[in-house]
Amino acid sequence: KRDEFNEPMDGLVYGVVVSLGFATYENYTYVYEWASTIAKEENLDFLEFSYLVAKGRSYSAIPMHGLNGAVMGYYFGLYAFSGNKKYLALSLILPYLFHGFYNFLGWPNMMIVIIVLLTLSLILHSNLQNLQLKKKKEQEVKKI
């Protein structure tokens, strides 16, 4: 075991950090490279268009990547401490499906994506609270 990864919650934290790092890179490419190309092709003001792209992605893509990283890290953390390969599979499959759902809906249905992301965040938060309570009870039993 490592001090840096000594409970399932650590997987969630690391997953979110990595996913938001990736989201930063991806947003850079969308805001500066993709928006620049589209602005030139459509004869739009680059700064105005790139601002709109950045603003839109800040409410959709960034939370989506953060949630996917949390889901991936949560299930990977469970796998790391249980050895159950079902959790390893879920750590890969669920973010893949959520991202595919996000891409499928796209901008016209973005409110649906936001509602789904919020719902999944609440479910994940509830599961984490249960895990933390379980760990706290285990630690109290060890003290006795």
PLM segments and residue spans:
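Hydrophobic alpha-helical segments at protein termini of multi-pass membrane proteins
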Residues: 1-144
